[in-house]
């Protein structure tokens, strides 16, 4: 798993605050030859709203769905120049790295914004992939042989919630925290 924080905003008199954490999750199966046999990419975007007093406004009992779980409800397809949802683009990237080694994955041409620049990938992926390339590299580095074989189905599941988040009080800061397992 990789974590990167993004888009958090302070609460003001005119607008609620936002504590946002983006969690990237990647699983790979890698052969003894270093070739990626399978890859699954997912991301969880947890968003918790709070007011100027530090009281959390979001329902902390809800499970936070991943972008793959959201599918079309994530809404990227409506704004994507190629009309593809996040989960479709992530699957295209995962499919693209199958059969490649990590040096080949790290060699994927990307722009300064982390978006793919090669015609073979831009037809199906226009979102920023720099962080996903790093996550694939990290997943491969952490992979250990547990008996999987080429052709086995790789599945990635997560459960994410913010149940341990707390409101701010006069004595202590609040905590907006997502837990993914």
Placement of each model-derived feature along the sequence:
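Active-site- and interface-proximal helix/loop "cap" or "latch" segments in soluble metabolic
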Residues: 4-181
